[in-house]
């Protein structure tokens, strides 16, 4: 499985190996008076943790401890999950570990 993910990562963009730290249910503003539900994933690369989410994803597709491939460009993130599925996410937050 790792070999498959590595081959996919080399084939295109600038993917880095990352780990899903946790996920949580959250809300986002859909319209003026309407709120939507989504799953926010916390994905860590080295000392940086990205918070990524995708509209209409209300049930988690990744679990804490999963190793994924992550490519971040601006506020967009492409994730290849542990099963090899590629999905586009929105970066909704980012944090550096203390001392970095």
Predicted regions and their residues:
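Bacterial N-terminal signal peptides
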Residues: 1-7
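Structural detector for short beta-strands of small beta-barrel domains
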Residues: 12-35, 67
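C-terminal partner/receptor-binding element of secreted or periplasmic proteins
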Residues: 15-20, 71-100
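Extracytoplasmic/secreted envelope proteins and their assembly/folding machinery
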Residues: 17-20, 40, 62
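Sec/Tat-exported extracytoplasmic proteins
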Residues: 24-27, 47, 72
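Short beta-strands and strand-coil junctions in structured, solvent-facing domains, enriched
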Residues: 29, 49-51, 76-78
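OB-fold (S1/OB) nucleic-acid-binding surfaces
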Residues: 32-50
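Short nucleic-acid-contacting surface segments enriched for D/E, G, S/T with interspersed K/R
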Residues: 56-74
């Amino acid at each position: 499985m790792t070999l498959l993910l590595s081959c996919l990562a080399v084939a295109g963009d600038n993917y880095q190996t990352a780990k899903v730290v946790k996920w949580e249910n959250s809300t986002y503003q859909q319209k003026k008076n309407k709120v939507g539900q989504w799953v926010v994933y916390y994905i860590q690369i080295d000392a940086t943790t990205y918070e990524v989410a995708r509209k209409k994803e209300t049930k988690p597709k990744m679990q804490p401890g999963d190793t994924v491939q992550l490519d971040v460009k601006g506020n967009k993130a492409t994730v290849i999950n542990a099963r090899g599925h590629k999905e586009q996410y929105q970066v909704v937050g980012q944090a550096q570990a203390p001392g970095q």
